[in-house]
Amino acid sequence: MKQYNRIKAAHPDTILLFRVGDFYETFGSDAIIASKVLGIILTKRGNGSASEIELSGFPHHSLDTYLPKLVRAGHKVAVCDQLEDPKQAKGIVKRGVTELVTPGVVMHDQVLESKENHYLASLHYTPKGIGAAFLDISTGEFLAAEGSVEWIDRLLRSLSPKEWVLQKQYELDLISLFGDDVPRSKLDDWIFTEAFAEEKLHGLFGIKSLKGFGLNDAPKATVAAGVILQYLEYTHHTNLGHLQGVKRLRETDGMWLDRFTVRNLEIIYPSHPDGVALADCLDFTKTPMGARTLRKWLVMPLTDRENIEARHEAVAT
């Protein structure tokens, strides 16, 4: 178990799926969680011995069935594979984490909803306001904003991110402001700096200035965007060629609805399991992209007459 313990220690906040032969196995508290979420048998390894530990697992070919269930339940999952042919191995087979899937960073079709965006959000807390960034890695849409607590709260409720990335020391502050109903990941303080964020953004997009993204006067939004990129690196998602840039969101872009309005009017989700949301009633779109766009329009009605008329003209044609 030394190899397992070493890899688990490097990913303590995940459920570690540890490849052993033809199975992915989980141990200890991970096994207890996996057994409950997946409905698989929980047993013990080393029954009756001092090293007894809980164990549960499933065949490796069932990964695409079981992994989405763990992620939908709000868990981060580290997939640890065998990195060499067991028949050629001298001693213990080399293993390593090949994929880290979190509620907000997922590319599996079994998890993604085609008609909804699947955002990862990062939040940068300061006494003078909050920065936020939102990335749907499946589509490449990358958004950033900064402003008051009320404004960021409206964004969070409108865009409904699946996971938040926070600064460790401000976790309780952000929970008190925005609630405790979304899975969270915490990163070290040194990542939440403007210089680090600019370096990450300049490097990814091959630019020398953030002015083209509208972030040159938005330090808190810039930090939040940089945090997103660092988190993607942490989760082994480095193939980001489909990201074309960052779009800055401004409070004047439209009428961003608060959480109570979105919930009480059942705009995106119905109040009851058998109910129907407004979005479902209006959705006659032909593509997943159109369905996602419609939902964003519903939670952010336009307020500028010229833009409203332009949208009406586009729909009419």
Name the predicted role of every residue range.
Residues 1-317:
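Charged catalytic and DNA/RNA-contacting regions of genome-maintenance
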